[in-house]
């Protein structure tokens, strides 16, 4: 899973990225301090994997991972090359979803490009640039398709209708993700890589002192916008997350306890991203390795097996599955098997989150 972190300059985007990866992107108080897109890979928090590691004491522990791409600060006019322009829009196109960091705090010492915090205005500014960039793509697609139809090939009529539907939506200033498509229309959208069609998780970046507040006016604005478009929202303080990133796991727990917070904002962000993209994890466990594997909800057993190795999918015979809770309750895989809790599933089995699996195959 690859997530692109976007936001206007000085909203706390690089501070957040530093917290995620400790990769050292220079979080200076100056627009465009992020000149190249930084990429960081972080583990997906999963206590189930920790528990399996206690049981199996494996040689290798491999959590699922999320790749974050820190996109340099976008500004009004980016789609026309202002600020750092189109190069960075192209980096977002390669991502599965967008994490849009929105400034939800006032601080005279941290310059805002518009002079003051304005969540709705900031979101609109970014949206306009992404929509304009997508409009340019759709114009080219429509022109190309019309030329093909002039050559007498009427097979492109349906394709053109889908492209024009998207174009009209964008021309009204709406993101492509607000559209709904019939099953046969989706086929024509797959290779477009439209940014405004990607799922969005808004990251409301609040002041440290507001971390325990339930009602924050700036955050309420972000939530209202997200609700209207079916996007997700997480509330974090990037500064607190940065501080947490410098601590040992033990000290992190103590720090969170002192703050009165159950879990780190970054953990919430990763989990919310999974939900937004409809992802789940299945687990494999043994003395050599315990590992989490990321798949889409609705994935069948052979395709899940293919995540491990293409031979597993090609020669799939069956999946031997035990629910994580059943395995833990019985202490070991063999004990669960003796109680009849390990099921033999075939090619049509739809994987569930937390399935602990052994795949049987023959090639």
Task: Place the predicted regions along the sequence by residue.
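Conserved G1/Walker A P-loop phosphate-binding module
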Residues: 1-111, 139-140, 144-145
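C-terminal-of-GTPase-core extension/linker across diverse P-loop GTPases
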Residues: 2-6, 17, 144-350, 357, ...
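Short capping/connector residues at structural and topological boundaries
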Residues: 6, 32, 37-40, 47-49, ...
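Glycine-rich, flexible loop/turn motifs
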Residues: 23-31, 38-40, 48-51, 80, ...
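Amphipathic alpha-helical transducer elements in NTP-driven molecular machines
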Residues: 32, 46-49, 62-68, 82-96, ...
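Conserved Switch II/interswitch segment of TRAFAC-class P-loop GTPases
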Residues: 40-45, 72-82, 93-156, 169-182, ...
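Short, well-ordered loop/turn sites that connect or cap secondary structure elements
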Residues: 92, 351-352
